[in-house]
Amino acid sequence: MNLPFKIKYQIFKFVSELYGLNLSKQKKGIRILMYHSVGTPVEEDLYNIYNIHPELFSHHAEMMKNHETNVISLTEKNIYLAESGIIVTFDDGFANNFETALPILNSYNIPFSVFITTNYVKEKKKHFLSKEQIKELSNYENIKIGSHAMNHVYLETLDKPALYNELTGSKDFLEDLIGKEIDAISYPNGSVNVRVRDICEE
């Protein structure tokens, strides 16, 4: 185990214990573990904060399993009735979510969700999920496919027509692709306000 990996692992262990993410007696409330890339450096990510080494990611999964963490799937009904738990998500739709993260999480029977920036798929952008991979992911009962808009933009900055196009364009593309309703979104860059939420709920 190299030094950077040791440091990252110890930081995760400290933070997870501090917030009760990996403990059997978990603190109340639902927490989200949001990942992006697993093993592939991300463009313009100078400090490599959006990419996690597969070995470290496997440790995360192992800790959740060993400590009997309540990992909640967004495919479950009435998930918000849970007193405590963790939701595992991936933003953007990197191909390694399918190639690397899926086998690891499946080995521990951990459900997860993938929020996809659909124009990355349309443009066949390097390192991102293909249509075929998205279809295969959607066939798993414990995997939720959601929207991350069409482009990775700040939704709050868009006028109403552009905002509507971003949201409905992504939703329509994914629904046509997998043949299932898309009823979940992760807002790109965390950019959301009342206007954005209202259009999402329409």
Annotate each PLM feature.
Residues 24-28, 81-82, 107:
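Extracellular/periplasmic catalytic domains that process cell-envelope and extracellular macromolecules
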Residues 54, 58, 95, 160-165:
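Non-membrane alpha-helical structural segments and their capping/turn regions in soluble enzymes
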Residues 91-92:
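Noncatalytic alpha-helical scaffolds and linker/capping helices
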